[in-house]
Amino acid sequence: MRPESLVTDHTIYACVMGSRAFGLATEGSDTDRRGVFLAPTPLFWRFEKPPTHVEGPADEQFSWELERFCELALRGNPNILECLHSPLVEYADATGRELLALRDAFLFRGVHETFVRYAHGRRRKLDADVRTHGAPRWKHAMHLLRLLMTARDLLRTGALTIDVGDRREELLEVRRGEVPWPEAEARMNRLVREAEEAAARSPLPQEPDRRRVEDFLTRTRRASALRAA
């Protein structure tokens, strides 16, 4: 089976991510599509296993096999967790809807470390841009601020909301370069501190609910095998 066929024929969940999902789209913004496919169980009985992810077949499209998606989500991967909370769902079959119903099972206090570590990587790139070019890439600075806001609010409330809502304009001001870098930098530092404070008393559980996720994955694999019998 061609990798593209796994996406076209076996997708269980598809959504739009990026600026459009974050409420930060402007004229000319790309449409970034993300999805989850369920590789038929018999494909795992071969020496050559199905891929864990597939790029395409459309432009700006990327999909994960369900098991890999769940593994990354259980580790608190920011990109994966945000996919499960996109406000722009394009498709979800019965299995995809069950995955969405499980999304809170992936949230735990460890997201503080994974989100902030991811943010630190982006921050280093911005600092390098400032040293080399005298200014950051403002679009990247905007998205870093958004990510830190999301992490802080998740730790405070226990709920992951990725649409920036009424913070849109203040973030777009950063994208347009209307906020001096020292001020943007100060906002980032403040958000990191606030996320750390929120982590100490977060309503999130200490660990994700691996048992629920594993039960879902096992039942899904079994059902796929029975359909192929």
Regions flagged by a language model, labelled:
Residues R210-A229:
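Short, amphipathic C-terminal "tail helix"
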Residues G23, L154-T157, A225:
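Glycine-centered secondary-structure boundary/capping sites
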Residues Y91-E214:
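Conserved nucleotidyltransferase catalytic core and NTase-mimicking acidic/glycine-rich helix/loop elements
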Residues M1-A94, A101:
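An N-terminal structural lobe/cap that precedes and organizes the functional/catalytic core
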